[in-house]
């Protein structure tokens, strides 16, 4: 079954329907998703429940992944999720809410502001993928 696109606006952002990202994508679906990304810039895949491996496999559709910033920090434990995924949550390696003075929490405060990931790199990131495990019941259409 071919994917369906539901544009949020005519030129920017689209919701993608009739696709299950837990299953291997057909070559046609892969091409359609890439084309939609280049057309709309933001794609929304609602109601997906991905494992870290499935998330990584889907992300690789857009190209090679850059190293996670936590891989450069010796004092940051990254045992909660796959080290190839940047953890921008408010949870520590034991799934407990971070303390107010935790380094990870303090360094992540800037993520609350609009920004473009990896724009400082010589070759900036082509895309960023956000996988929300908990979305606000009202107004959560980010």
State what each model feature region is.
Residues 2-142:
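Fe(II)/2-oxoglutarate oxygenase catalytic core
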